[in-house]
């Protein structure tokens, strides 16, 4: 891959390297009987990250855990996919070009107020963006990257 690589050795092991050479790996151990849902009742998750490898990998992990997840690679694409996919959750990176994750989250809340939003960031300096959203009356949960996939899965299943 041009922007990194990903590898799934088994259903319980994962690893990826992003375009900046940052590597993440781990073991996934969960009760798949509890997580796998019938196709028509699976929670839909739209995963948004400007690093395609991260968006693709997180969507694949969530799909393997029983969710119906698709990736988007920028805010504009996410808005377009949200209009067709009608996700229960949007999981978005905060720092993206053109439309950042907070701007995307605000646009989603205006159009789809029942959609849950989870912001992800590997950068500590995003408090100004979050504060701007709060001044506009929006509250969002933030999880720092890199994040273990089980933490994401747990957050989505607990928030449902």
Region locations from a protein language model:
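Acidic catalytic/metal-coordinating carboxylates
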Residues: 74-77, 100-104
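Charged docking surfaces used in two-component/phosphorelay signaling
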Residues: 56-64
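Hydrophobic/aromatic residues positioned on beta-strands within the core alpha/beta folds
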Residues: 120-122
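Short hydrophobic/Thr-rich beta-strand motif most characteristic of the beta2 strand and flanking loop
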Residues: 66-73, 81, 143
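Alpha4 helix (beta4-alpha4-beta5 surface) of REC/receiver domains from two-component response regulators
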Residues: 103, 124-144, 150-155
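Non-catalytic signal-transmission and effector/linker regions of two-component phosphorelay proteins
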Residues: 1-44, 148-160
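Receiver (REC) domain active-site loop signature in two-component systems and cognate sites
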Residues: 96
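Active-site beta3 strand of CheY-like receiver
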Residues: 85-91
